[in-house]
Amino acid sequence: MTRLAVSRRVLLGAAIGGAAWPGLAAAQAASQLLNVSYDPTREFYREFNAAFAERWRAQTGQSIRANASHGGSGRQARAVIDGLQADVVTLALAYDIDAIAARGLIAPDWQSRLPQNSAPYTSTIVFLVRKGNPKGLRDWGDLVKPGIAVVTPNPKTSGGARWNYLAGWAWALRQPGGSEARAQDYLTTLFRNVPVLDTGARGSTTSFVQRGQGDVLLAWENEAHLAFAEFGADKFDIVYPSLSILAEPPVAVVDRNVDRRGTRALAEAYLQALYAPEGQALAARHYYRPRDAAALAAAGDRFPRLELVTIDDPAFGGWQRAQARHFDDGGLFDRIYQPGR
């Protein structure tokens, strides 16, 4: 998929002309940085990396290169654990960074180092449907109708897929007579309508948008808007369900790697820049919900209000509990998703 059309010239002008991004003045570091990120952040970090490098050079006189690696969040976390030399990680959910921290690569207190539990922007899960919504898919209950083909990635490898699953679980619990048994039955029926599980969100978007597979894509809000912008309002509609989930993609410095590579100052400045006005404005342009009130207000009606549950809802109990119960080997997802059954 091609990049979202965002004016980098405007962004860079604002960055260079405005106040310095935090941490730039004092930082001295090596000339390259690797951000290991999840699937649908490609366009955002392409723009952000170029803007950050330009601002860094203007402030320090040093030319640097910020690179990015993208894939399913769980697979990306595993790659870092297995030796991929990330300076920073910007993943889909806190559990994936906790998994890296558990191997000693990131300090246990990583989530307290930056504001908002180290999540500089938020997102949610929406439905992307064919133009005119021919199957009438308006809420989670519609996804289990006979003959509906649902496109979603694999929760074992994709952070977005885990958010998709949990949003559906929360909706089912809140229905009249809702219970955990009924939520499990609901998701079992939903996943019978999923013909194939891609490993990451971008792969699922490609399957739906470019290959014409499925009737509905369960998508990150920004990914749905990217498809809408790139392929035209005459091809797709975006549906906001009655209930979704507050996704808080977190960021962290990979301590062991930056200390070995001498890139800590650069890596810390890079993540701090995500919270600066320019970083927040760029996040909003790419349909990530900014934390900064001014950036959110400037976005106008770009982000519809909807009811959102959080991962700390008693239904989930935080990421450690949710991961163990739903997504670890032998968890509920393994019972729910049984291809060919």
Predicted stretch roles:
Residues 258-341:
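Extracellular/periplasmic juxtamembrane helices and adjacent flexible linkers that interface
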Residues 132-138, 170-178, 257-264:
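Short helix-loop capping/hinge motifs at secondary-structure junctions, enriched
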Residues 2-10:
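Bacterial N-terminal signal peptides that target proteins for export
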Residues 10-27:
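N-terminal export signals
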Residues 29-158, 300, 337-338:
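N-terminal segment of the mature folded domain
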Residues 175-242:
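Ligand-binding pocket segment of bilobal, Venus flytrap-like solute-binding proteins
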